[in-house]
Amino acid sequence: RIVVTTSSTGLYGNFGQANYGAAKLGLVGMMNTLKIEGAKNNIKINAVCPVAATRMTEGLMPEEVLAQLKPEYVTPGVMNLVKQDAPTGMILSAGAGAFSMAEIVETRGAYVGQGDALTAEAVEAAWDKITDTSVQTHFNAGGEHGQNIFALLAAGKKG
């Protein structure tokens, strides 16, 4: 079992921390690849995105807030990421005794066209469909993303 530590800065951004955010999101990319490579050997890898009082957060928040963010309030969630029947490829957000799952998802999207029909204006005309979050898909591997692109292509050429 492997657990990497990502960060809300990597998942969502934070002013002045581009290098840190890039490194922390890079761990999510590594996790997504290793979950595929390790599956045949029952190697499971997950990520925790903790909100906890650390040396990095000292002085940024009042003591009464930091008291609610003890690192041990993240630990029970991490324990679930390493148990025998643990998931793999999960991003667990954890802090102050609260837990949620974060995911990278993609909207249904739209086929816009090819050749002369494919213009910035055509993409703009389809923007509402491209950015519609009412239908979202979580891909388990990069190949699934490619399959989705070709499904949009096929549907677009039919209609």
Where does each model-flagged region fall?
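C-terminal helical subdomain
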Residues: V65-K157
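Residue(s) in the substrate-gating loop at a strand-loop-helix junction
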Residues: S7
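Conserved Rossmann-fold SDR core element
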Residues: V28, K35-V48, A86-A94
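Conserved cofactor-binding/catalytic machinery of classical short-chain dehydrogenase/reductase
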Residues: A18, G26-G29, Y73
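Short, flexible catalytic-loop segment of classical short-chain dehydrogenase/reductase
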Residues: N41, C49-G59
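Conserved catalytic-site region of short-chain dehydrogenase/reductase
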Residues: G10-Y12, T54
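Active-site helix of classical SDR
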Residues: A23
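Active-site loop immediately N-terminal to the catalytic Tyr-X3-Lys motif
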Residues: Y12-N19
